[in-house]
Design a protein with these regions (language model features):
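Phosphate-binding active sites in nucleotide-utilizing proteins
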Residues: 1
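Cleft-lining beta-strand/loop regions that shape enzyme active-site pockets
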Residues: 4-196, 233-241, 247-255
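Metal-dependent DNA phosphodiester-chemistry modules and their immediately adjacent helices/loops
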Residues: 63, 158-160, 195-226
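Short secondary-structure boundary motifs at beta->alpha junctions and helix caps
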Residues: 226-234
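Extracellular low-complexity, Gly/Ser/Thr-rich intrinsically disordered linkers
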Residues: 228, 246-247
């Protein structure tokens, strides 16, 4: 039962939860023994569920990278090209993954923003000093930029700055790109809101022109290693693109 209203066999109980996100709801559960147990729960919105699923996906990917690399590599996902995502990546690569030999940068399903310059600066560090304390190495310099090996994963769902950021990563020869091609969608837009504030859209006003005179818009970015996640393996929890990125980066490290 939900809030005292019994749920009969075949009954659609979703209307009983409609509009109840964030509220205390009494749920009565009848066990096989016939005993009824009351539980007070707080339903969450679909948006919260999606956020929880996303965090679980990131944790799963990070665990797979640690397992398949033997702890040699770290994993970060750029959820968006924005400040919160950058802070998470910055904290992880210079914190929890500071001991790792390299990092897997996942940009799949990123809807864009503006972060290509920040990612370029962060991942293009070159070691020039080692800080030493009483005969023990403390840290490398620069200590606020990543100066180890990295690799980037892309996918067809990358959009806007999630096309421009991998392009800069490729152009600056920062590392290999693994995954699927990214549509040429690198532009900047002005956001316009209509009289109904739920309706808004971006109007492209800025193009990004390369030295040869062509634009990033409509210029599809091809990965160095083209890997498709087949549906037969996705449903089993496998991520072939992630596995390929791990293998390629480990091979790069082993050749040093």
């Amino acid at each position: 039962a939900i809030n005292g209203e019994r749920i009969l066999k075949g009954m659609d109980y979703y209307p009983l939860l409609d509009g109840k996100a964030g509220e205390r709801v009494l749920v009565t559960i009848k066990k096989a023994s016939g005993l009824e147990v009351d539980e007070v729960v707080v339903p969450v919105s679909a948006g919260v569920v999606n956020s929880l699923l996303y965090k679980r996906w990131v944790r799963h990917n990070a665990a797979m990278v640690e397992k398949l690399s033997g702890g040699r590599l770290g994993y970060v996902h750029l959820e968006g090209m924005n400040d919160p995502s950058f802070r998470t990546v910055y904290s992880d690569i210079l914190g929890r993954y500071n001991h790792c030999e390299g990092i897997v940068i996942d940009t799949r399903f990123n809807g864009g923003g503006r972060l290509h310059e920040d990612i370029e600066v962060l991942f293009s560090g070159e070691k020039y000093l080692t800080q030493e304390v009483r005969g023990k190495d403390a840290c490398d310099m620069p200590s606020r930029r990543y100066n180890k090996a990295s690799i980037m994963i892309t996918g067809e769902a990358n959009y806007s700055n999630a096309h421009g950021t991998p392009w800069v990563y490729r152009y600056k020869k920062m590392g290999l790109i693994v995954g699927k091609p990214v549509p040429g969608t690198m532009t900047s837009v002005n956001w316009e809101t209509l009289q109904d504030p739920t309706l808004y859209f971006g109007i492209p006003v800025v193009g990004y022109r390369k030295a040869d005179g062509t634009y990033l818009e409509n210029d599809q970015l091809e990965p160095d290693i083209d890997v498709e996640n087949t549906k037969e393996l996705v449903v089993t929890g496998r991520d072939e693109q992630l596995e390929a990125a791990i293998k390629a980066l480990l091979n790069q490290l082993n050749r040093k």
